[in-house]
């Protein structure tokens, strides 16, 4: 299953925000610079993540963005469910004439469930915890 770029960059943005000291603000521009992503696309992503409570957005001269909840409470499967259209195939009878006899839909639904179940085992914190190479790649300080 391939994630949309929206979900992919949303997860990447959350990873970057999770590497910041608690409460520290950064800018959307910084996140786009780190990942080389379109600022307009990232604004839409951060807006959605903000609506979902994963990101706090602070307006004003000293504003910015930061995680909206502790990284250990952000479950990857929940983020994917909230940002990803999870319909793998269109199985309506109008679209496919074998729908009444097809077993593929059930198999794909099981595969999607297994995919999400694996993501449910991991939090945002588990991606960054004890991962100095990631911190180096994100140009974040590595603490011993």
Swiss-Prot record:
- Could you give one GO CC term from the UniProt record? cytosol
**The HTH rrf2-type domain covers which part of the protein?**
2-129
User: Which residues fall under the DNA-binding region feature?
Assistant: 28-51
Keyword vocabulary terms for this entry: 2Fe-2S, DNA-binding, Iron, Iron-sulfur, Metal-binding, Repressor, Transcription, Transcription regulation
Biological processes annotated in GO: negative regulation of DNA-templated transcription
Entry keyword Amino-acid biosynthesis: no
List residues traversing the bilayer: none
* PROSITE patterns to which the protein is assigned, alphabetical: HTH_RRF2_1, HTH_RRF2_2
What name does the UniProt record give this protein? HTH-type transcriptional repressor NsrR
């Amino acid at each position: 299953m391939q994630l949309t770029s929206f979900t992919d960059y949303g997860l990447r943005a959350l990873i970057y925000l999770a590497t910041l000291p608690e409460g520290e603000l950064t800018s959307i521009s910084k996140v786009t610079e780190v990942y080389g992503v379109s600022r307009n696309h990232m604004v839409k992503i951060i807006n959605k993540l903000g609506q979902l409570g994963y990101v706090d957005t602070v307006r004003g001269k000293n504003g910015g963005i930061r995680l909206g909840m502790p990284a250990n409470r952000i479950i990857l499967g929940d983020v994917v469910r909230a940002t990803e259209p999870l319909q793998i195939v269109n199985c309506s009878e109008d679209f496919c004439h074998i729908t009444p006899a097809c077993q593929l839909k059930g198999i794909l639904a099981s595969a999607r469930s297994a995919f999400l179940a694996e993501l449910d085992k991991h939090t945002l914190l588990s991606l960054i915890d004890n991962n100095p190479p990631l911190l180096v790649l994100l140009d974040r300080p590595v603490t011993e």
